[in-house]
Curated annotation (Swiss-Prot):
Top-level taxon of origin: Bacteria
SMART domains per UniProt: S4 (SM00363)
Organism of derivation: Buchnera aphidicola subsp. Baizongia pistaciae (strain Bp)
Positions of the catalytic residues: 140
Described function: Responsible for synthesis of pseudouridine from uracil at positions 1911, 1915 and 1917 in 23S ribosomal RNA.
Residue intervals of the S4 RNA-binding domain: 19-83
Location within or outside the cell: Cytoplasm
Enzyme class of the recorded protein, top EC level: isomerase
Pfam families assigned to the protein according to its UniProt record, in alphabetical order: PseudoU_synth_2
Name the UniProt record assigns to this protein: Ribosomal large subunit pseudouridine synthase D
């Protein structure tokens, strides 16, 4: 079963540096690849001022109104499942949750059920009619914290656009191995590891990624950080922190080879080793409401496991 989503945009002057239809579409709808957009043109899914244009090299003008009828697969292949969601805000257009750990966001290889998507489909059947069931960004399975979900197609496209334009503030708290001397910014491209495809690595051939980090508190052998994402690449924080030799506590994928300090107490060593997940929490989310345009902000306190870890580290300063 296929559903439809209509995208509409007005051609600005800046897009007319190259006024071919396919080039203008690529500049207006950057989330979609040139190949996909060209396919929509040839399939007669694109209208300019209400008239179908099916030639990629057709010329468009300033203030022309372009619309695309996108088709996407409905989520009927996925099962609605009654899974608890910690909802901290909801209206007709958006849903904000505080995601728990050990919770996959979207079905994939090895995770076809028990995900956030399955939970959303159970909560409201209208999510079947929204791309990705309204999920506009992700958190890793064992990362906790704030996520926003779109409840209709208008909100979905508006939130995607805000993320693309870097208008959404996503702030995290993390506990890392090592004593970080000062805050900083990491600007390093990230690419999928060609040897181990489930992981990411820093590589100049990858996608540009920017991570800002600030010190909240230093401990003897660890540091509590505030981290702000400017981009949102897969495993970005975990990959970047490993790159600068301050991997996340509990990260079995990106921190398991980190050497513990020799003078650390045995009690602390055992507790840190037993921490069950990467110590990472999405603590602050700030965005413009997709309909009212009001600036909205949500904050989430650290989960119990991270609070307990900080308390333990405080005792060993």
């Amino acid at each position: 079963m296929q559903n439809k989503l209509k995208l509409i945009a007005i051609v600005p002057k800046i897009s007319l540096l190259k006024n071919r239809l396919d080039q203008v579409l690529a500049s207006l709808f950057k989330k979609h690849s040139r190949t996909i957009l060209k396919r929509h043109i040839l399939s007669k899914d694109v209208c300019v001022n209400g008239r179908i244009l099916d030639q990629p090299d057709a010329k468009v003008l300033y203030k022309d109104i372009i619309s695309i009828n996108l088709k996407f697969k409905a989520k009927n292949d996925y099962q609605a499942e009654n899974i608890f969601l910690n909802v901290i805000y909801e209206d007709d257009d958006i849903l904000v949750i505080n995601k728990q750990d050990n919770f996959v966001v979207h079905p994939g290889a090895g995770n076809t059920s028990g995900t956030l998507l399955n939970a959303l489909l159970h909560r409201d059947s209208t999510f079947f009619n929204i791309p990705r069931a309204g999920i506009v960004h992700r958190l890793d399975k064992d990362t906790t914290g704030l996520m926003v979900i779109a409840k209709n197609n208008l909100s979905y496209m508006a939130l995607i656009d805000q993320i693309k334009c870097k208008k959404v503030i996503r702030e995290y708290q993390a506990i890392v191995y090592g004593k970080v001397i000062s805050g900083g910014t990491i600007v390093k491209s990230i690419i999928r590891n060609p040897i181990k495809r489930t992981t990411m690595i820093v590589n100049k051939c990858g996608k540009r990624a920017i991570t800002h980090y600030r010190i909240l508190k230093r401990f003897t052998h660890h540091t509590h950080l505030k981290i702000i994402l400017e981009t949102g690449r897969t495993h970005q924080i975990r990959t970047h922190m490993l790159y600068i030799n301050f991997p996340l506590v509990g990260d079995k994928t990106y921190g398991n080879k980190f050497k513990f300090y020799k003078n650390i107490s045995l009690t602390l060593l055992e507790q840190v080793k037993k921490f069950p997940r990467q110590a990472l929490h999405a603590s602050r989310l700030c965005l413009y409401h997709p309909v009212t345009k009001h600036l909205m902000e949500w904050n989430s306190t650290l989960p119990r496991d991270m609070l307990n870890l900080i308390a333990l580290l405080n005792k060993n300063i």
